[in-house]
Amino acid sequence: MEQAPGLDAARDRRSPPAASLAPAARALDAPAPEPAAAANGRGVLVVIFATILIDFVGFSVLIPILPLFAESLGATPVQVALLLTLYALAQLLFSPVWGWVSDRVGRRPVILVSLAGTVLSFLVLAFARSTGALYAARVLAGFFAATIGTAQAVVTDVTRAEDRARGMAVIGAAFGAGMIVGPMLGGLLSELGAKAPFYGVAVLAAANLALAWTRLPETRPAGLASPGGFELLRALVPTPLRLLAAVHERRIALFLYLFFHLFTAFAVLEALITLYVGRLFGASMLDVGLLFAWIGVVLVLTQAVALRRLARRLDEAQLVAIGLAAMGGGLAALPALPGFGWFFAAGAVIAVGNGIAIPAFTSLYSKACRAEQAGELLGQSQAMATTGRIVGPICGGALMQSLSPGAPFVAAGAMMLAALALFRAARGVLVAPEV
């Protein structure tokens, strides 16, 4: 699951993950609706909600489908995991560039190109007859993964500062709904054929593109200075190098290392659980779709309801410890489960842990960042999350292929419990007064 922005935001409403910032093209000269200054901000937010909802449905629909489809083409567990790794890697490398283009050219063309790329990537998936074609489709999808960051910029453009949190909550609500609807839709469409979900999402993405084309105005402020070549060069520097340059103190380094632990472990679950339950229990794409839809429901309810109540009674460090223990125990227990039905219980435990720990941990991290570096360091936490999504699947796939089907989940659980031990040992450094 994606990273939540912090406990304070979670008390309001579930906030969106940070994602790619966005592509654009001067060649896209379609007549735009009226400028943002004359546009109704609420109407723009409705379009953004629909755009992000369909975009996340397209992302999450693949969770129960792609691993089994790739395996049917002869892919090994490592090759299946590589499909997720390539997507995350392409997103990590190109997101800053699309962000630069978004600031220079505008939000609308960036979103349109991103959505068109989504249609193309799903059509490539639908016609794929080899693992090489699957790789190409996932690299394309990662390259064009620009909608979320640009949507955040649109919300910033059309809302006042005092309404910003509610505006961002629109993206969070779309994300949560998409993570529930996507796996369920993928599982249901798979009953019509293994490729039916790809065609279905391509149609949805095309409808999404038509909606944005006709209803989304340009929102980039007219007086906003365009970034120059230096900003582009900086964007082209790989994120890990910028990350190393930004970390000067042990406290920040510890936080970022723990972010890496959290998202590496969870990425193993997303990447490989479909193969595991399919091989051991004969679970179908529909079965796995329902499982992940259930996990999405529990995650959303945890962050929208339970977290608010727990935050009144427990401090952030206690919430982090509880969440890490739940995730670690739930992941490590997966290989011991005797039947597929038990995965719904374990999935709920993992989702509750994730929904509690990530916002609380992000909130602690934000308090550790000095005001003048908060934006960059919060962005670097997202980079560590994406790096975890790159490393986790490929390492988990190697463990599944070389050791046993359950080995990746034992390792992921151990990694989460190691993060808990490190957090408790370093609590005096990590949990300190706000700077």
List where the protein language model places each region.
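Helix-to-loop junctions at the C-terminal end of transmembrane segments
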Residues: 95-106, 302-315, 400
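Short amphipathic helix-loop junctions that connect adjacent transmembrane helices
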Residues: 64-77, 271-287
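Conserved MFS/SLC helix-loop-helix module at the cytosolic interface between two early adjacent transmembrane helices
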Residues: 92-129
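Helix-breaking motifs and short loop linkers at transmembrane-helix boundaries and internal kinks
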Residues: 74, 106, 127-132, 282, ...
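Juxtamembrane intracellular "pre-TM" segments in multi-pass secondary transporters
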Residues: 31-41, 217-256
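Helix-loop-helix hairpin linking two adjacent transmembrane segments in secondary transporters
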Residues: 171-214
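C-terminal transmembrane helical hairpin of 12-TM major facilitator-type secondary transporters
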Residues: 317-361
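Cytoplasmic helix-loop-helix junction between adjacent transmembrane helices
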Residues: 137-176
